[in-house]
Design a protein with these regions (language model features):
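Generic structural signal of hydrophobic/aromatic residues within well-ordered alpha-helices
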Residues: 4, 22, 195-199
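Flexible, acidic loop-helix segments that line cofactor/substrate-binding pockets
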Residues: 5-36, 50-57, 74-79, 142-143, ...
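Conserved C-terminal structural/oligomerization subdomain of aldehyde/semialdehyde dehydrogenase
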Residues: 9, 58-201
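Basic phosphate/pyrophosphate-binding loop/patch that engages nucleotide-derived ligands
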Residues: 36-42
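Conserved small-domain helix->loop->beta segment predominantly found in fold-type I
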Residues: 43-53, 65, 69
Length: 201
């Protein structure tokens, strides 16, 4: 926990909401949602928990400890709140089962030195995209899609995937006005049937 605090301070200072380079939330309503949710866990905030509604900046906020069934870990936060769930090694499988039964997230990140376990975990969950021992970098990889799944959004974007997702192909045929395809018209004699059977092969 202390290392996490140090990392935040190193990046954006002890009062990040006063840092000019620190980004703001998209709108006043978004700021209020984050501030209100943080306030519900005021007694468990171990870092942050402050901001400026005027600038719409809210500091990265660590909330600990949080239970896996508490409201804050059952929805996408879309803000700088980090709830931390404590668990024991022998509780990991049960925890993953709980996660897999919920709405699928846009991203899924795990940190481990065990490659075999990492592969097993990544294959056991559904998510838009993910990383092992990293965050967000999968969004920057050229030539692969960025996508959601279920509640986090359907479809894939970036490159050719984005083009296909946001376009709708329509087939249009220009017919000749000077000739008529009599083959398709009644009566269907033997000659027409033979020709049609060749077209259909």
């Amino acid at each position: 926990m202390e290392e996490l605090k140090k990392a935040i301070i190193k990046q954006v200072g002890e009062k990040p909401y006063l840092n000019e380079e620190y980004p703001k939330l998209i709108a006043k309503r978004a700021y209020q949602n984050i501030a209100n949710e943080a306030e519900e866990y005021r007694d468990r905030i171990v870092f942050g928990g402050e901001g400026s509604e005027e600038t719409l900046k809210y500091s990265p906020t660590i909330i600990y400890p949080v239970g896996i069934n508490e409201p804050i870990v059952q929805h996408e936060i879309f803000g700088p709140l980090l709830p931390i769930v404590k668990y024991k090694d022998d509780e990991v499988d049960a925890l993953l089962n709980v996660i897999s039964e919920r709405e699928h997230g846009l991203a899924f990140y795990i940190f481990t030195k065990n490659k075999r376990w990492a592969k097993k975990v990544m294959q056991s969950q559904q998510y838009g995209g993910g990383c092992i021992n990293e965050v967000c970098l999968h969004l920057m990889v050229k030539g692969v899609p960025f996508n959601g799944v279920g509640h986090s959004g359907m479809g894939a974007y970036h490159g050719i995937w984005g083009f296909r997702e946001f376009t709708h192909p329509s087939t249009v045929l220009f017919g000749k006005t000077k000739m008529n395809l009599s083959l398709r018209e009644h009566p269907y004699n033997k000659k027409k049937k033979n020709l049609l059977s060749k077209f259909l092969k």
